[in-house]
Design a protein with these regions (language model features):
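A short glycine/small-residue-enriched secondary-structure motif
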Residues: 50-56, 95-98
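Small/polar-rich, solvent-exposed N-terminal microdomains that initiate assembly or binding
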Residues: 1-49, 85-91
Length: 128
């Protein structure tokens, strides 16, 4: 499984329907935007047998308007999506999400006054 598979899946979810999503860095020209950036995970403890699952790490970096409450609510909606989704199917692989550190990180506002947050996610997937 690749981060692109996750991006394509996320684009189909109602919680992310109103936000452009791309791989790489944040697009500072858009008021609403999600950038998905791969992050390195430490050693992963085996789930099931050592060869049955693997994981990738993703940093979801979100910009969402100039109203803090609206931006925070959108991020909570996305966080809830990951916490409540069990056995998602991405290209025939079963996927489970774990939100790292429990809470998103508030990154502040950019020079245009747009609020930015980061949510770190571990994506466990069934190996084929």
């Amino acid at each position: 499984m690749k981060i692109n598979d996750f991006m394509q899946w996320l684009k189909t979810q109602p919680a992310a329907a109103d936000i452009p999503i791309e791989l790489g860095s944040i697009n500072g020209n858009k008021e609403k935007f999600i950038a998905l950036v791969p992050i390195t995970l430490g050693d992963i403890q085996a789930i099931g047998s050592p060869s049955s699952y693997n994981a990738i790490g993703v940093s979801l970096r979100m910009r969402y308007g100039k109203n803090f409450t609206t931006a925070q609510n959108k991020l909570k909606e996305l966080q809830s999506l990951f916490e409540k989704t069990e056995n998602a199917d991405m290209n025939g692989q079963l996927v489970y999400f774990m939100v790292n550190e429990g809470q998103p990180t508030y990154n502040g506002k950019d020079i245009k006054g747009v609020f930015e947050f980061t949510l770190k996610i571990k994506i466990f997937y069934e190996r084929k």
